[in-house]
Amino acid sequence: MTDEPQSDEQQTTEQERPLGTKRATRADGLRRPGVRSGLAERRSPAADSVRNGAAAVRRFLLRDVFALGLMIAALVIVILFFTLLGATKPTSSGTGIPLSQVFTLARDRAIVEATLLDEDARVQVHTRDGAEYWAAYPSSGAQTATLSSALERGGAIVAVKQQPGKAQVTIVVQFLLPILLLVCLFALFMRIGQDGGAGGIASFSNFTGRGRKKGKGTAHRVTFADIAGVPEAVAELAEIRDYLDDPSRYLDLGAAAPKGVLLVGPPGTGKTLLAKAVAGEADAAFFSLSGSDFVESLVGVGAARVRDLFAKARRMSPAIIFIDEFDAAGRKRGAGIGQGNDEREQTLNQLLVEMDGFSGDGGLVVMGATNRPDILDPALLRPGRFDRQITVDTPDVHGRSEILRLHGSKRPMAPDADLDEIARLTPGFSGAELANVVNEAALLTVRGGRREISQKLLEESIDRVVAGPAKKHLLTERERWIISIHESSHAVVTEAMGTGATARKVSIVARGRSLGTAAHMLTDRDQTIMEEPDLVMQLIAMLAGAAGERIEFGHLSTGVHDDLHEATSLARSMVTSFGMSDELGPVTIGEKSGEVFLGASLQDLGAVGPKTLDLIDDAVERLVKDAELVARAILRINIDAVHETAHALLEHETLSGVALEAVLSTVTTVEPEHFPELRERERGSARDRDA
């Protein structure tokens, strides 16, 4: 390998370099001469801020001729000020002495000639020995006459120098030029502030978000081709794009395009990405900002920014205004407990007026994105403002497969990588989480020095996204056996119920706060509606770990905490939300309150009496205990499979694929209709053991 730097065609960036390859280095371990070190590229943040600010001001001045003229005028005033400043200084030559000494020299007849400077209020004297002095005297007429008389009595020749024009120059330098300079600077700062880009006095009340003029953006824009898994949302937004491109198709039929489109969905489902795609495809101006940008510490700033934003958008019509995290600006009015001012309400009121004012906005579309539509003000959601609400939910198994293919197409995938199986392994994942799975797999590929992303690394990345990286801390043999029994019980019970959800991986490797995992693979179709038997089987599977520990050791460990918490929460939902209890019947208890200040997330149990609360607790306890009894009965039938799986886990730590199928092949299947019989049998056995 030579020490010569590579040519431009040979050099590649980190993004272009294939996965698993390393940056080229010299044989002695040093970088090539053409590569700068990280230390050489470090710059001061303060210097960068000053440099960026200066560049912004320079671009603004070149764009605004009036501001450039103000800047030139200010420079001329400064130059003129320093030029005339010397002319206003008092004229003085010789040595300065007190005025009393001048009177003494005059009495001694030592002064030959004296000159009175009228504007400077100074006297210059020449003595008989050739010395030259000056002294300041009061500029009143009486003092001047007294000094002149004393000099004449001393035999000096007295002259008065008028200094014409010096008073006017002094006024110009001391008063006029500073005022003109302040006026120019004030006008310049106001001009910069109104532009909104370089900062300034008016920038508080101006729209400061991101925007671009009419056009389809740069070559790196986001389009609908970059979106997968949400075909319904894409179809709805494509209609908005078509209207902005050719409104005549809709106007000929008397159809009016929606004034506002609200994207609603959980975090990470692609709401912001959809807005970027509309901006990338529509031939319209695009303005983007966050709902929190409207709220400032200064009262009235939010409303002013709303007015400025809509004014700019109307001037550049057709235009799209996108407000991310819309709930920050559109929260319900009138319920702000402890609210110190009505700044948020002023902002919302101005937004309501702008979206449905007296003037028609034919080419203006407002898009908002939020994951909390329940706290938005109802006035925003009525037709005429946000006419259309588009729900962007987590993708189903087919949508997940499309999203994984979209991200996988940008990376080298190994032949064994099955993205359809990864889609089945990730129920409930959002688009952002799926992108993170593929990215984690790519990072693991680079870490292992490989060139392609394999199926094993994709499955490992799922575990990393769900539970975190694996921990390498040491456990005692007793602790490892407890965890093995716990996770094996989950896998065996899930396999025995035969619901179509089979265990795909069991591990005793600790991740995050979990000491082990028993992941399950769903069928090729996500279940949309859950029936009561489905939820009961979920309860049984959740409590299988606790049941296995109770059978094997006669007591529970702290490792069942998360399982008990999830099972209790599910049982309470079955009783209070789904009406699946004999004690209360088909009723819903604990509607969510509408307190906006509290986030509308607390249950309102004020109208529920203590007797009903006791019934709820009894029903929840019955569901949980019955589910554990069934889990114990299933485990007693398949206790040999539990032990075989646990011993395999102690040896290999993780079981999946063929190895897991082998240890679970002896599991006896139990049909749901036999659950009541198993429950009563286990309850009777428990009574016999207690007796």
From Swiss-Prot:
Keyword entries, A-Z: ATP-binding, Cell membrane, Hydrolase, Membrane, Metal-binding, Metalloprotease, Nucleotide-binding, Protease, Transmembrane, Transmembrane helix, Zinc
Disordered as annotated region, ranges: 1-48
Membrane topology, Cytoplasmic segments: 1-64, 190-691
GO MF term list: ATP binding; ATP hydrolysis activity; ATP-dependent peptidase activity; metalloendopeptidase activity; zinc ion binding
InterPro entries assigned: AAA+_ATPase, AAA_lid_3, ATPase_AAA_core, ATPase_AAA_CS, FtsH, P-loop_NTPase, Peptidase_M41, Peptidase_M41-like
CDD domains (alphabetical): RecA-like_FtsH
Subcellular location(s) per record: Cell membrane
Cofactor: how bound: Binds 1 zinc ion per subunit.
Top-level lineage group: Bacteria
List of residues binding ATP: G265, P266, P267, G268, T269, G270, K271, T272
Topology term for the membrane: Multi-pass membrane protein
Active-site residue list: E487
SUPFAM superfamilies linked: FtsH protease domain-like (SSF140990), P-loop containing nucleoside triphosphate hydrolases (SSF52540)
Primary site of residence: membrane
Enzyme Commission number(s): 3.4.24.-
Segments crossing the lipid bilayer: 65-85, 169-189
Topological region Extracellular: 86-168
Subunit record text: Homohexamer.
Function: Acts as a processive, ATP-dependent zinc metallopeptidase for both cytoplasmic and membrane proteins. Plays a role in the quality control of integral membrane proteins.
Family, per entry: In the central section; belongs to the AAA ATPase family.
NCBIfam families xrefs: FtsH_fam (TIGR01241)
Name of the featured protein: ATP-dependent zinc metalloprotease FtsH 2
Organism: Conexibacter woesei (strain DSM 14684 / CCUG 47730 / CIP 108061 / JCM 11494 / NBRC 100937 / ID131577)
